[in-house]
Regions:
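A short acidic, Gly/Pro-enriched loop at the edge of an enzyme's catalytic core
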Residues: 188-203
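Non-catalytic, mostly N-terminal accessory regions of nucleic-acid modification and defense proteins
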Residues: 1-76, 83
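SAM-dependent methyltransferase catalytic-core segment centered on the flexible catalytic loop
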Residues: 115, 119-139, 201-202, 207-234
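Conserved S-adenosyl-L-methionine
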Residues: 74-188
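Conserved Class I SAM-dependent methyltransferase catalytic core
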Residues: 157, 163-165, 212-278
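Flexible, glycine-/basic-rich loop-and-beta segments that form/coincide
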Residues: 58-63, 67-68, 270-272, 277-281
Length: 281
């Protein structure tokens, strides 16, 4: 409920329940407030009321693959938004050098590989319980046959074996581990792993200001990025707002500038999304 009203949300719930009971009174429909098959939703926004059915039955923003988690793991929806904000195209070469639990690379693989996030959740959809006269097995089979898992060039690197393992396991649960290359790689070795100007997009969630060696890490990160990133490539970072100026300072040292910037919220935490490009020298 959004807006100022002279009633409470519980009042709306009561009225909605009364309406449903009256509506289905003579239709041989069992109404059970605890053991239910169909969830009805009521949204009151200022002077308007929207009444509908929950077709999903579960939170569509949740990612079932997120089992092995880094303490500072990104939400899947935010990671996906970061990938799209970067300008990443499906056939491009993408690198996440601070992969943590792999969420950015996994979301990029979903997009680039044309693989549905909810592929393994089909049996959980609430609309399967609705009597719509639809053969849902045939419905999903028709969609599944279109899935090709297009070959991708996505690299998920971290300097700790633990998080490389986390990334690989989460990707396997997601069903797209074959679309990502996983490896334990130190920042200093990126110019050995990749040829000069061979990467289209670097997309990552770098270490925060709690790290004592942050200056050294960012300096090395932008130094390596300047070598492996194509001239028209981009670096897309998500960080705490308090770290953004520090990041920009090190980016400037290696001739990168901010081409666009946005603020996003993860719960009550404000995060900064910055997209960097190379300066024309």
């Amino acid at each position: 409920r959004i807006g100022a009203h002279d009633f409470k949300s519980v009042d709306v719930e009561t009225k909605a329940a009364e309406f449903m009971i009256k509506k289905f009174k003579n239709r041989n429909v069992k109404i059970d407030m605890k053991n239910f098959d169909i969830i009805f939703l009521v949204y009151v926004i200022n002077s308007k009321c929207y009444f509908g059915i929950d077709f999903a039955g579960f939170a569509l923003n949740k990612r079932p693959y997120k089992i092995f988690l880094h303490p500072n793991s990104l939400r899947g929806t935010i990671a996906y938004a970061l990938v799209r904000e970067s300008g990443f195209q499906k056939k491009e070469v993408m690198l996440d050098p601070f992969s943590r639990d792999g969420v950015i690379a996994i979301e990029a693989a979903f997009y680039a590989g044309d693989f549905p996030v909810g592929y393994y959740n089909k049996e959980k959809f609430a609309f399967l319980k609705l009597k719509l006269g639809i053969d849902f097995d045939r419905f999903f089979d028709k969609i599944d046959k279109k899935i090709k898992k297009t070959k991708t060039k996505i690299y998920s690197y971290d300097h700790l074996f633990k998080y490389v393992d986390y990334s690989r396991k989460n990707a396997k649960i997601a069903g797209i581990d074959k679309l990502i290359s996983f490896s334990r790689v130190e920042l200093e070795w990126l110019d050995i792993k990749f040829k000069e100007k061979s990467i289209d997009r670097i997309i990552t969630n770098p270490p925060t200001s709690k790290n004592a060696n942050l200056g050294k890490i960012y300096n090395e990160f932008f130094y390596q990025s300047a070598y492996i990133l194509k001239d028209n490539g981009t670096i897309s970072l998500i960080s705490r707002v308090s770290d953004s100026d520090f990041i920009k300072k090190h980016a400037e040292k290696h001739n990168f500038f901010v081409s666009k910037e946005n603020v996003v919220w993860s719960g009550e935490q404000q995060l900064n999304v910055s997209v960097f490009k190379k300066k024309n020298i």
